[in-house]
A protein has these predicted regions:
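Short, small-residue-biased leader/transition segments that mark boundaries at the very start
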Residues: 3-4
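Structural register within alpha-helical repeat arrays
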Residues: 46-47, 86, 123, 130, ...
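Residue-level signature for tetratricopeptide repeat
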Residues: 49-50, 89, 126, 133, ...
Length: 210
């Protein structure tokens, strides 16, 4: 109904207003922080996360700020995380050549813990997306194969109770036509995310696709 539509538009407007205020607050801290590169990097990273699904150009801008700060600090560990995040941001928004370029800059043997999971997730996502848009069937299957191998590697390092693990299991099961299995994973996933959060919205979207 028109009333429902107006309510949803109002909710959306309120969300954008609150989101923008949150970003402006972090931005103010960022511009007031001088000299302390560690703090500036954390604030730039927070600005990336705040813009990740909100304003792509801003997300990329602040990741480049993170990369510049990591280089200035000669902090290779932070730099690997920055490269992975930027590769994934490009992959998620359709800039596949840029994503591949930043993936190639990552020093894979140097990655540890969560960095390994993030890397596998990025690779699986990127090659899956590239495969989807390829016209050549042989190349398409090659890229899907790469995506699946990185997905399996991701499963091997993630706890089976993590939201990311359950998310990818939902996609894998649904893609293979195992819809009941996908729904079971989705039920577990739903119990782990809070309502009215981006994580819940992500779960609800994939649940609606099963």
């Amino acid at each position: 109904s028109d009333v429902y539509k107006r309510q949803e538009i109002t909710k959306s407007d309120q969300y954008i207003k609150v989101k923008q205020q949150h970003i402006d607050d972090i931005k103010l801290k960022y511009h007031r922080t001088h000299g302390d590169r560690v703090s500036r990097h954390q604030l730039a990273w927070n600005l990336f996360k705040a813009n990740e699904t909100f304003m792509n150009d801003s997300a990329i801008h602040y990741l480049n700020e993170c990369i510049a700060l990591s280089r200035q600090m000669k902090n290779s560990t932070l730099l690997q995380s920055d490269y992975t995040a930027l590769a994934h941001q490009y992959a998620a928004t359709g800039f596949y050549n840029e994503a591949l370029d930043y993936l190639r800059r990552i020093d894979r043997p140097q990655l540890k813990g969560q960095q390994i999971a993030d890397y596998y997730f990025c690779c699986s996502h990127l090659y899956g997306e590239m495969g989807y848009y390829l016209k050549d069937e042989a190349l398409k299957q090659q890229y899907y194969g790469l995506s699946n191998r990185y997905r399996d590697s991701l499963f091997s390092v993630l706890p089976s109770t993590s939201s990311l693990y359950l998310w990818r299991k939902v996609i894998a099961a649904a893609s293979a036509g195992y819809y009941r299995r996908a729904m079971r994973y989705c039920d577990i996933w739903m119990n782990q995310v809070e309502e009215n959060t981006p994580e819940y919205a992500n779960m609800a979207f994939f649940r609606s696709e099963i």
